[in-house]
Amino acid sequence: MEFLPISWRLQGKVALLAGGGEVALRKGRLLHRSGAILTVVAPQVCDELLDIVVRSGGSCVVRAFESADLDGVALVICATDDRSTNAEIAKQAQQRGLPVNVVDDPSLGDFIFPAIVDRSPVLISISSSGASPVLARKLRAQLESTLPARWGRLADLMARFRQPLKDKLSNIGARRLFWEQTLDSPVVEKVLAGKDSEAEAMLAAAIESADATTLSRGEVYLVGAGPGDPDLLTFRALRLLQKADVVLYDRLVGKGIVDLARRDAELVYVGKARDKHALPQDNINELLVHYAKQGKKVCRLKGGDPFIFGRGGEEIDLIVAEGIDFQVVPGITAASGCASYAGIPLTHRDHAQSVRFVTGHRKDGSVDLDWKHLVSETETVVFYMGLVGLREICSQLIAHGRGGDTPIALVSRGTTNLQEVITGRLDQLPDDIEGREIHAPTLIIVGSVVSLHPKFGWFKP
């Protein structure tokens, strides 16, 4: 981030606005709405800005800027039509340690104004970090059209009931879960429909019947994070990820996905490379139980789909044995996601009538598969975690009847901006990549459908 979004209480603070024209007027309106006291300095000041200054309880000085104008102010806005004047005012303000905004010239200042969607007390700020104010305004317009006007009333209602809920529930986790459930309840629709008294009665009744024991009960979410691209995360996965108190994630989950977790969530890295586990599987299982028994909502975030070579079944075994509530959220498995991004349809009427997923290595590191059932010319075979065993995979397929000229693809870091697709022949690919640096995770696709990659390959990172 180039700029840190913050919410700053300006009520009762003096803001110096250098400039008296249309640009200064726009900033003056915004500052007045925030409760700031305006001091305007400019050789000429438009009537509307002068009126805003009076209503804010501030003052207007009709002359050029002087250093003494900086005395006693909390922030400075430079909005004159002269860049050198703006630069000089900004320089003097910064020498005093005052935060400065230079309109339409962020390089000279310390902060910028975002586009704002105002549903007070709910505020949404949108910024392009000065790169494209037009883009920020467009995003704001889209949000304005979709966000109900009465969200602010809902926030006010929740604020009024915060203390009664604290009196009822001492556990902060239980209170957070109560509010999450409230936001999925008919209370919201009542407020949005203008039926405030009905909403208030429903909320009061819900607080009265709130059960700390039930709300404090731990739960485990086994969530498939998909093959890498955060855009492939499901809505349910995102919702539970942002609800979790603790997130256990492994190497196959990209940082862009982990960053979607709640800012105050505890993040626990558990590794899970092919043969180098930061934590053994048994320890991971025990951690899930440990956190859940503390009453926490635990998200076990796994690359791909939890039930397709994700060892999700092993993790659920202990959870079930301990009587802990759990949910399983499917994810787009690597075979589907990586093949799609590589432009390789796993089935095709003219090439393959079936597809088979197999693991490229076992617990002991071997590649011991039922090879005779993997050589059908009308079937696509996808190998997970097969990079280390690639040479053996190719030789065994050929030895059991698959043609040496069968197309094969190796997809590295699929669906991400670092995706690489290497195609070749079954009898040549191991030699083709000898000495090349191939990054995990990888996926191997064998079958004539691979020949469609040059034609269908649409993703160009």
Swiss-Prot record:
Recorded catalytic activity of this chain's protein: uroporphyrinogen III + 2 S-adenosyl-L-methionine = precorrin-2 + 2 S-adenosyl-L-homocysteine + H(+); precorrin-2 + NAD(+) = sirohydrochlorin + NADH + 2 H(+); siroheme + 2 H(+) = sirohydrochlorin + Fe(2+)
Binding site for NAD(+): E22, V23, P43, Q44
Catalytic residues in the record: D250 (proton acceptor), K272 (proton donor)
Record Pfam families: CysG_dimeriser (PF10414), NAD_binding_7 (PF13241), Sirohm_synth_M (PF14824), TP_methylase (PF00590)
Binding site for S-adenosyl-L-methionine: P227, G303, G304, D305, I308, T333, A334, M385, G414
Chain positions covered by the region annotation Precorrin-2 dehydrogenase /sirohydrochlorin ferrochelatase: 1-203
Positions bearing Phosphoserine: S128
Keywords: Cobalamin biosynthesis, Lyase, Methyltransferase, Multifunctional enzyme, NAD, Oxidoreductase, Phosphoprotein, Porphyrin biosynthesis, S-adenosyl-L-methionine, Transferase
InterPro entries reported for this sequence: 4pyrrol_Mease, 4pyrrol_Methylase_sf, 4pyrrole_Mease_sub1, 4pyrrole_Mease_sub2, CobA/CysG_C, NAD(P)-bd_dom_sf, Siro_Cobalamin_biosynth, Sirohaem_synt_dimer_dom_sf
Region described as Uroporphyrinogen-III C-methyltransferase: spans on this chain: 218-461
EC number of this enzyme: 2.1.1.107, 1.3.1.76, 4.99.1.4
Gene Ontology terms, MF aspect: NAD binding; precorrin-2 dehydrogenase activity; sirohydrochlorin ferrochelatase activity; uroporphyrin-III C-methyltransferase activity
GO biological process per UniProt: cobalamin biosynthetic process; methylation; siroheme biosynthetic process
Pathway(s) per entry: Cofactor biosynthesis; adenosylcobalamin biosynthesis; precorrin-2 from uroporphyrinogen III: step 1/1; Cofactor biosynthesis; adenosylcobalamin biosynthesis; sirohydrochlorin from precorrin-2: step 1/1; Porphyrin-containing compound metabolism; siroheme biosynthesis; precorrin-2 from uroporphyrinogen III: step 1/1; Porphyrin-containing compound metabolism; siroheme biosynthesis; siroheme from sirohydrochlorin: step 1/1
HAMAP family given in the database record: Siroheme_synth
Family: In the N-terminal section; belongs to the precorrin-2 dehydrogenase / sirohydrochlorin ferrochelatase family. In the C-terminal section; belongs to the precorrin methyltransferase family.
Function: Then it catalyzes the NAD-dependent ring dehydrogenation of precorrin-2 to yield sirohydrochlorin. Finally, it catalyzes the ferrochelation of sirohydrochlorin to yield siroheme.
This protein's name: Siroheme synthase
Organism the protein comes from: Alcanivorax borkumensis (strain ATCC 700651 / DSM 11573 / NCIMB 13689 / SK2)
